[in-house]
């Protein structure tokens, strides 16, 4: 029987996390999508762990999925005033087994909504080169609040409301790069 553990990544996890991210983002690289996660190296992974909240799903001592939360106060130009998630990746051999969904649900409900009382969260993805990912987020309750066409792709910013009575749509804003 497998025991799943949710925890913050540490710098000691950097090497294993790099392998996970590189493996999971290989198909994205083949689509010519240039996200930081698609060109990650050990320094980038270490900095991501040190500067943000990189959460991992560990099963039987192995890191199988990860997602990072960036908070608005970590940057002078945050994507919005709500937490932003990125570097969401699951080892390919666990694809279709619900590991990524389990981790994302944990981050949305336990970490952001229940512990941090965040009214919403945001993320960015490709709507043209990687449309099935945007569709997956829509099925999970995310909505597009910003889109921009650039370099043959459509980048979209999406949000999910976690605490409706505390959500303020004006805090979404347009990303600084727009």
From Swiss-Prot:
UniProt entry keywords in alphabetical sequence: Acyltransferase, Transferase
Biological or metabolic pathway of the protein: Amino-acid metabolism
Its biological purpose: Involved in a cysteine salvage pathway from S-alkylcysteine. Catalyzes the first step in this pathway, i.e. the amine acetylation of an S-alkylcysteine with a preference for S-benzyl-L-cysteine over S-methyl-L-cysteine. This pathway is likely important in the catabolism of alkylated cysteine generated by proteolysis of alkylated glutathione formed in the detoxification of a wide range of electrophiles.
Domain (N-acetyltransferase) ranges: 4-163
Example of a GO MF term: L-cysteine-S-conjugate N-acetyltransferase activity
Xref: SUPFAM superfamilies: Acyl-CoA N-acyltransferases (Nat)
EC number: 2.3.1.80
Gene deletion effect: Growth rate decreased by 4-fold when grown in presence of taurine as sulfur source.
Induction entry: Induced by glutathione but not sulfate (at protein level). Induced by methionine and taurine. Positively regulated by YtlI under supply of glutathione as sulfur source.
Gene expressing this chain: snaA
The keyword Transferase is annotated on this UniProt entry: yes
Protein name: S-alkylcysteine N-acetyltransferase
Enzymatic class: transferase
Similarity-based family: Belongs to the acetyltransferase family.
Top-rank taxon, per record: Bacteria
Substrates-to-products reaction catalysed: an S-substituted L-cysteine + acetyl-CoA = an N-acetyl-L-cysteine-S-conjugate + CoA + H(+); S-benzyl-L-cysteine + acetyl-CoA = N-acetyl-S-benzyl-L-cysteine + CoA + H(+); S-methyl-L-cysteine + acetyl-CoA = N-acetyl-S-methyl-L-cysteine + CoA + H(+)
One Pfam short name: Acetyltransf_1
